[in-house]
Structures are given as structure tokens and as C-alpha cells.
Amino acid sequence: MKILVDAMGGDNAPDAVIKGVANAIEDIEAEVILIGQEAVLNTRSKEILGKKLDKVSSRIKIINAKEVITMEDIPTQAIKTKKDSSMVVGFNMLKNGDGDVFISAGNSGALLTGATLIVGRIRGIDRPALAGILPAYHGNLVLMDCGANTNCKPINLVQFAQMASIYISNTVGIKEPKIGLLNIGTEETKGNELVKESYQLLKKYSQDLKINFIGNVEGREAFLGDVDVLIADGFTGNVFLKSIEGFGKFVKKSLKESIYKNAFSVIGAIPSLPALSRFAKSMDYKEYGGALFLGVKKPVVKAHGSSDAKLF
């Protein structure tokens, strides 16, 4: 297996990418191809990895790409004009069969555009979308779309539900995953026009599309185990996702401050530390890797823009 990695994408690139790949390569049976500015990658690899570089270098290959698509770049323009960027080179390699999967922590809009224009959409899908995995009371919750498409039509949300249902059925083994529509209430009449129209389409065609649609789901109910997939447009989904990440940080920080407030609280917390550690770990978005683009012909993974070595 060949894993293509955009070494220049993300807030902490290329250092976090280099560290992450070097740590992971020992535990996976794959060749990793780093795509980016060759001189920079060679220099940083030597400085960061030191002697460890000799151990992993045989399974890590560097492909030169002179340009970088930044977070500030206009997505479509960047994909069309920066032909020698790490992202575009990666997409072309994936399309041509020079790799099995492409991973990037770079510009989400550019990643969506490149995946759509270069790798290509699956027939019948208007817009690929990001399927992110979140912790839930029983197992995990898939959120789709979690940031790729900020402006959607009702048919897009129906297709998101269809793709997510097939994805969960084939990867997790849930035969009829429960699909919910993220909304401000459970009633059919609640929500904006996009959500209300999407609800009616999902209700009407769920049987034909083999979607187990259970209706509207409020954010506060999403993690209780009653839904397997939460459907939203990319704007709403991303706000929801970032809110969860922020709340997780708040909980971890508050617990830490409470426990270490004084010696008595530290001693009192000792029996609960394993459970608290597991809880804190479940709230850490770094434990859940990247989001998979569903709807394109080959696997494309979007890592968090602020990914560190652990997440990679």
C-alpha cells in the first residue's frame, strides 16, 4: 500500500507531518510518499528525526512539489493555477494510480475542489462531502458534512445520507445505520428552508434509497447513542464540530484545574484518575484522525488543519 501525504498542508507543516509519519511508519505495512518542497523536507527530516531517519528512510519517499496551497488561497483558483503544489501533485498521483490514498491537512475548499476536479466524483453524486467520526455513548457518531460544502441544496443532504449509510454499513457492519438530520428541534416544521426541504425529501425517498431515516435530531441528543449518522450542510456541521472540540478542551482544562487545586483534591482524585483519563481521551479530537471525503473515486482524507504529529 502506498500512502500519499501532502507534507506542506496544515498549520504545523511540514514538521508535524514528518514527525507523525516517522512515528506511524513503524506500526503500518505501507510505503509513505511525502509530497512537498524537497529541499525543505530533507533538511527538516534530518533536524527533526536525527538518527531515527536512518531507520525509516527506506519506507519514506519524497516527491518534489515547488508550490504550496495556503489556507488563505481561493480554492478553485489555487487548484487551477498552482499545478506544482503539493496538493495538486498528490491528487494527480492518486488519479494515475501512483498511490492508494491521499492525506492532507491543507485548505479544505481546495481539497474538495481538487478531489472533485482531478480525482473525479462517483457517478450520481453532485458534491463529495466530509464524513468525520465523533465519540458517542455507544461507539461512534459520523457527522457529514463536517466542513466541505458551506452552501448546499436539499438534494445534497439526501446524497450525504445515502453515502454515509453505505459507508457505515460496509465499514462498521451496521446493517441499517440510523440517519438523523441535525436541527434545532425534532418537529418536521422546525429549521430553515434547507433543513425542512431536506427532511421531506429524506422522508419521501428513504425507502427507495435504503436509508434508515429517523427524523430530526437536536445537537444535545446526538451523542446519546440513538443515531449513527448526523447529516448537515458543511457550514452547520463544521460549527457543530468546532463547538464540540472547544467544549472538550474546556472540560479537560476544568478537570485538571479542579484536581490539582490542592493536595486534598489530588489525593481524593487518585482512585478516579484512570476513568478521568479515559474520559479526557474520548473528548480529544486528536484521537479521531481525519475525515474521509465520500463521493470521490479514490480515498481522500482531510486531516485537521491544526494537526500535530500525534494526529498524523
Predicted regions and their residues:
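N-terminal phosphate-binding or glycine-rich loops at protein starts, especially the Walker A/P-loop
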Residues: 1-43
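Short, glycine-rich nucleotide/cofactor-binding loops
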Residues: 3-15, 148-158, 302-310
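Glycine-rich phosphate/diphosphate-binding loop of Rossmann-like nucleotide-binding domains
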Residues: 15-16, 28-33, 39, 151-219, ...
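Short, conserved active-site loop motifs that form the nucleotide-linked donor/cofactor pocket
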Residues: 59-60, 141, 211
